[in-house]
């Protein structure tokens, strides 16, 4: 068996990726979230596949087909809520994974980092089109508001929006194509994840100390397979608690009402994992400016490798940048809170301050703190 896994063309790839992979001996539990994201993707694809067997992408029957899944299909309620809450778990793991990458300087591995940003954007797109499918009030109005943002693009905006809608409003054509996108995108995410791993294994993982670990590597199996299994069991425990005890806690009550184009909800807001970007969008009074800020709020992650001037790897020995990093995390939480609040004083003002702070920390404060720390090292 040992000879087979090292020589067989297919098993050799698996062996080099998950068994004999040389891994730093000191990586902490923060490195577990990559495998947890893989687990979340598997859960989402499997539950989504079973949901797709019973779902109908037609405006007249979409809402009732979701109700039918929950009421009449064997364990349909469980599959539906595993899928809905699985998306939340996916984004929790994703945010922690990106946060760990920023803290420990993983953005230095630029190819892996940039593929990760593409994965992040693709996952957000998948979640957005998926949120439209139950065809509740918030699904419909969320789709209308977010797709309508493209009309801010000069010259081609209106045509582009009508092209995406497949008509002059969000209707049957929109729902059908969103279902098609939602079905295919997870498989594209899986393909990108393999490319992400490919680039990671070219350079090897970094580690919490930020020091070169070439002289201190251990095989991935059994040490980290056991560690990842513990993480997977804990993830499943949290997901099952969420699904079985609090299935609707992260959903929107408006989505229990079928979509009605003639009745606008009091506060249109996306799912919780988009609220930080939604708050940035709303904080700019100009429509085109808001859309650009929304896109930049994610794409600015690509600036980390370019703005990095530090002579050290990661933040473990950099107290000044550590403080700025935790202010950045707190600021993100404030943006998430503001995104779910109505557009009125004082929330608009807090949102504008938090949005400016978000970009200022990445573009100004972190590079300045890097320079300060480099000068301290010279002393």
From Swiss-Prot:
It holds the Pfam family Cytochrom_B_C. Heme b b566 binds at residues 97, 196. GO terms for molecular function: metal ion binding; ubiquinol-cytochrome-c reductase activity. One of its GO terms (cellular component) is mitochondrial inner membrane. It is found in: Mitochondrion inner membrane. One of its GO terms (biological process) is mitochondrial electron transport, ubiquinol to cytochrome c. Heme b b562 binds at residues 83, 182. It is a multi-pass membrane protein. Its cofactor is heme b. The chain crosses the membrane at residues 33-53, 77-98, 113-133, 178-198, 226-246, 288-308, 320-340, 347-367. SUPFAM superfamilies: a domain/subunit of cytochrome bc1 complex (Ubiquinol-cytochrome c reductase) (SSF81648), Transmembrane di-heme cytochromes (SSF81342). Coiled coil: none annotated. The keyword Mitochondrion applies. A ubiquinone binds at residue 201. The keyword Lyase does not apply. Component of the ubiquinol-cytochrome c reductase complex (complex III or cytochrome b-c1 complex) that is part of the mitochondrial respiratory chain. The b-c1 complex mediates electron transfer from ubiquinol to cytochrome c. Contributes to the generation of a proton gradient across the mitochondrial membrane that is then used for ATP synthesis. Belongs to the cytochrome b family. PANTHER family: CYTOCHROME B (PTHR19271:SF16). Heme 1 (or BL or b562) is low-potential and absorbs at about 562 nm, and heme 2 (or BH or b566) is high-potential and absorbs at about 566 nm. This is Cytochrome b. The gene is MT-CYB.
